[in-house]
């Protein structure tokens, strides 16, 4: 996110635009993101750049922004309602599928697999897992667990250790 913020500030300076950055401390804090989104809408900006932390929970608020003529740009994730004017994102289905195909080339027919994903319910995590399962093909049935680390390194480390203890025959942890 640091690179995105730096790039946004540079572009704002180049185009003589004013920006204000509002973000929750934790990526999975949907409630706080929605509070900040409401605050931003009340300030009446020309545009809002957002990476929605929920596929569903911000829809009504974003609809309000659209009704007020505020342009909406999504970064790397989106909501179930297509309210955005622009989306800049990774093709998460394709990325997940490529990882799944690579993983399948390393695994045997009975090898157990676990997934440590970033934030439950966010479109990027959903699509990456879907693509990964597709890439695995028949080996997708070997996925024994999916856990979420909320984009926190230490939590992902702890969850991975717990998975390895819970499934002693685990051959791969994908994330």
Label each residue range with its predicted role.
Residues 1-175:
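A residue-level marker of the well-folded mature domains of exported/periplasmic proteins
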